[in-house]
Design a protein with these regions (language model features):
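A short SAM/SAH-binding and catalytic strip from SAM-dependent methyltransferases
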Residues: 128-139
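Class I SAM-dependent methyltransferase SAM/SAH-binding core
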Residues: 74-117
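Conserved alpha-helix/loop element of class I SAM-dependent methyltransferases that forms part
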Residues: 44-62
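Conserved class I S-adenosyl-L-methionine
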Residues: 63-72
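A short acidic, Gly/Pro-enriched loop at the edge of an enzyme's catalytic core
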Residues: 117-128
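N-terminal auxiliary segments of SAM/dcSAM-dependent transferases
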Residues: 2-18
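S-adenosyl-L-methionine-dependent methyltransferase catalytic module, highlighting the catalytic core
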Residues: 19-48, 75, 94, 101, ...
């Protein structure tokens, strides 16, 4: 992929005064600007995104415009670019710290978030929007999906991945009164669940909830698949891989949807 300049935003409301941040958004900004907050994509997620993008780009005879929203440190974006050469990729993230890391990879980058006031991108500009393990971090998922749909061309693809609240091990943990993996009750520490790292997850989804939300926001032709989670203990990894065949209980939900 190669970098490309994006057209200026022409959506309704462009140029209007930005609304003032609410206190929770300020706290989230501080959380994501902290160098200790994880922004790395990890090799599994990077390869997964590259494969999803390759499938979405099949049949394009001209260079497609791809927006990777929530690109983090750019590692996954860079791999996707290398494996899908000839298309235009732009990485977007609201964290200046994450973008400082991503710039070392020579990517085209924009500091912006998918929540209000939205992306500095004209309506119906993008062929593909990637939201790889992003939606669980957002305060306003409705506005984010509205914005993704706004910038997509008719029939354009939304590629989305997110941890599964109903993963096979979470079903057992919840039955035992243990907080499910991936879910969080605080940005300051981990309480009541396995693990020690705070990731900033604000929303969690089952397959049914996620597909219902996407359909309500004007996306159709939903294709859902499952993926494994890299932190599953070694002895349980074959089981985690097997559950990928049953997306409703897989560790990670992968969705390819199209703008209706």
């Amino acid at each position: 992929m190669t970098g490309t300049a994006l057209p200026p935003a022409t959506a309704a409301g462009a140029g209007a005064p930005a609304r003032q941040d609410r206190p929770p958004r300020h706290r989230l900004q501080e959380f994501y600007e902290n160098p200790q907050t994880p922004v790395s994509s990890g090799p599994d997620r990077a390869r997964r995104m590259a494969r999803m993008l390759a499938r979405a780009l099949r049949g394009y005879s001209t260079a497609a415009v791809v927006l990777d929203v929530g690109c983090g440190d750019g590692a996954a974006t860079s791999i996707a670019a290398q494996r899908n050469a000839g298309h235009h990729l732009v990485g977007l993230d609201w964290s200046a710290d994450a973008l400082r890391q991503a710039r070392r990879l020579g990517l085209t980058l924009v500091q912006a978030g998918v929540e209000p006031p939205g992306l500095p991108v004209a309506a119906e500009t993008a062929d593909v929007v990637i939201m790889s393990e992003l939606i669980e971090h957002l305060i306003d998922t409705d506005s984010a999906l509205d914005e993704a749909r706004r910038v997509l061309k008719p029939g354009g693809s939304l590629l989305l991945s997110t941890p599964n609240l109903a993963a096979w091990y979470n079903r057992g943990l919840l039955a035992l009164g243990v907080q499910p993996v991936f879910s969080e009750v605080s940005l300051r520490g981990v309480y009541g669940r396995p693990g020690s790292q705070v990731a900033g997850h604000l929303h969690m989804f089952t397959r049914r909830a996620l597909t219902g939300l996407l359909t309500a926001h004007g996306f159709s032709q939903l294709r859902v698949s499952g993926a494994r989670y890299h932190d599953v203990p070694a002895l349980l990894r074959p089981l985690d891989l097997a559950f990928c065949a049953w997306p409703a209980a897989a560790s990670i939900l992968l969705v390819h949807a199209r703008k209706s």
